[in-house]
Amino acid sequence: MLTRRMQCLRGAGVFRTVAALPLLAQRPNFYRPLTCSALRRNNDHSYRHESRKDKEMQDLKESRKMREQEALDDAAFRNTFEFAVEKTRDSDGKSPEPEVEIDVDREAQTPWDPVGSQSRHETRQEHRERFDDIKKTLPSSVHESQPQMYKWFGEKMDQIQAGALTAGQTLNEVTGYKAIEKLKLSIEKLEDEVLEARAEVREAKRMYSDAISERSNSQREVNELLQRKHNWTPADLERFTELYRNDHANEHSVNDAKKRLGECEHHVEDLTLQLSKQILTRYHEEQIWSDKIRRASTWGTWILMGFNVVLFIVVQLGLEPWKRRRLVGSFEDKVKESLQEWEARNEARRLEEATMAATATQAITELQRRIESPHVSKADVVEAEAEINSIKTNLATWFKEREEEEKEEIAKEAHELAVIAEDPDMTDVHHKPHPPQPVDTERVVRPHLVENFEHHVADPVHHPTLPITSTPVLEEDAPPPRIHPLVQMSPDSPDDGTKTFTATRDGYDVHPLVVRPTTPPHFMLQVWGAAKLSVESATNKTVAVVRSTFQTAEQRPFESTIVASLGGLCGGLVTFLYLR
């Protein structure tokens, strides 16, 4: 019976638990002998209690483990954050703050409490906000906040770089250098294989030498045992048997090592031969490629030289003549326009001077008629002569002022012509880009009627009653008569008063004009017309000379052009010889 009950107790697991004893001790009044069913119920209750306690312990361990992991994460985050803050302050030139030491074990062993977890959560949130503020100043954030134009420019530059790389690859494919690059990579790979094969050969030699040395040692030991065969012990017999049994294996190992060594050496020879062939092939292909590029470079040089020669011919035979023609034509137009303006002004001045001279002549004629009348008194004669002298003086003063004005205009027009000759494209010459040069205005003058005024008034043909000697010559030292700015008096004038005027233009003397002292005003008008014809003829001759010069320059290039042509041809020849 006792044995059976012990079996029941052992089967119920009473000996495995101790938790049910205090419960039984707390209820002494209800104590009764235990039966198998009661013990089974108590054991079930204790088992459930144990399971609940085990579950609580497991939950406690898991919560403690989670707290430890959170403490480790917080410590790592704080370390990272402090490091980032220190680096940022160092980069800004500020002094770093003192580091805070964190005891991870103490953080992990701290009992869990909701208040502490809330404070740590707030601290973690604050650290994350500060880290977000610092993250805004990082290069990646700055790049994201850059303007769209800057990003677009960066993308375009990347595309251009990629396009340049693609163009280089395309050029290599077109020229055939890509296959050479593949061959180069194959050679490099084969060199690595040769190095590995040589290492295998060295390893095979070592194994072969080890096998030979092991077999030699075994044979030496066998020979030693055979020499003392009559003194063998059981151990010597066993050793001899073992050595004799291993001799066959040693022989096989030596043969295998020798065979493997031969295979490795043969493999190295094959790889070396293949490497040599590929190196020779690469050298041959690179030579062919370099010859192709050199040939293309030669043709490109010839094409460039031909383009330069064609461009030189076009410039010298097309552009330069057109430029010279344009310069000459522009200068001709400016000169003709200036001459036309000059002639128009001279015509107006001539008419004005003729009108003034005619008016003065009429007035003086009336005064002379009054003097010649028989009923005039001596006082009236003196008054009339004084009035005549006054008219002559005023007329001379007026002509002198007009002459000064004309000299100034001549100097101005000469300066304009000089500017036009220097730069025919200059249209606004009144700004005077260059300082005016002194002009010889004494040689270039206009007609002056004051010198011949006495002869006009005292003409013996129209006034036979008035002797020539009775009229004084007011301007004996006046310059010789001048009809046109381009008309000057011949220095070989006779002493009888006859003057010869010649229209001069660029060294050409045309239409000599002979003027006598008694030339009437109406003949002076004919002289004016002849002078105009002389100037026009001189202008036409000047234009003819300019055109002849232009044609000569067009047919015969300048020496500098010839030198430049020879220099270009010599340079091209030297370049071609150098490339060849």
From Swiss-Prot:
Transit peptide, UniProt annotation: 1-20
Transmembrane segments: 299-319, 558-578
Residues in the Mitochondrial intermembrane compartment per record: 320-557
Membrane topology (UniProt): Multi-pass membrane protein
Coiled-coil blocks: 177-275, 377-423
Mitochondrial matrix domain ranges by topology: 21-298, 579-580
Annotated region described as Disordered, given as residue ranges: 45-68, 86-134
Pfam families per record: She9_MDM33
Single GO biological process annotation from the record: inner mitochondrial membrane organization
Keyword Nucleus in annotation: no
Subcellular location: Mitochondrion inner membrane
Keyword field contains Membrane: yes
Highest taxon of source: Eukaryota
Main location: mitochondrion
Family named by the database record: Belongs to the SHE9 family.
Function of the protein: Required for the maintenance of the structure of the mitochondrial inner membrane. Involved in mitochondrial morphology. Causes growth arrest when highly overexpressed.
Subunit structure: Homooligomer.
Protein name listed in UniProt: Sensitive to high expression protein 9 homolog, mitochondrial
Organism: Yarrowia lipolytica (strain CLIB 122 / E 150)
